[in-house]
Amino acid sequence: MPKDKDNDPRPRHVAIIMDGNGRWAKAQGRPRLFGHHEGARRVREIVESCPELGVKYLTIFAFSTENWKRTQVEVSGLMGLFKKYLLTEIKDLCDNGVRVRFIGDRQRLEPAIISLMNELEVITKDNSKLNLTIALNYGGRDEVFRATKRLAQDVADGKLHPAAINEETLPKYLDTLFLPDPDLVIRTSGEARVSGFLLWQSAYAEYEFIDTLWPDFTPDIFEHVLRNYCKRERRFGAVTP
């Protein structure tokens, strides 16, 4: 993609709802977990393509707070896949200069997964080529709820005066306090809904809902979506002169 250093139209922060693994597997006559494994492979390709495409921040929706409602077999399989992915990708992520951080409520996750998450955050903290954020056991409403509880506790403890609370206060308590707001949110699989993903942060994001199932979402398709984004005019609530 062409780049004008003084006026780069490309999205700095892209967030992706990776949907369609199960339907992709069903179309192949395979179990749902097979689709999740193929989806994990696709993550690597998209991560590797980001620096060349000018994406500085990539946030991916890996597991929502509602996904616990799936069958125990699928949930257990997904947890095993997360552990395998975190273990096998550590070296490649480091070699490619990727900094990894996680958002979501860690309390319900297995200690082994939490340990790997913590390790990956520490090992990659000095990397700067790409900032990869993985939303794991994440829900937008849950995030705001947890943030509000922490804010209320600070008020109760006398650390924060109610009169000092404004629109800029809550983001400091969100999981994403270290991230800029997303410029573009992509959802694969043809579903046109946000599923609680980055509800507060995406107020002025552009959305792209595409029919492609996640395991079929190639870097070429990713680049095409980014090119479409570059043609849009973001007004942030203002009127075009």
In which residue ranges do the predicted regions lie?
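Flexible, compositionally biased loop and terminal segments
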Residues: 1-241
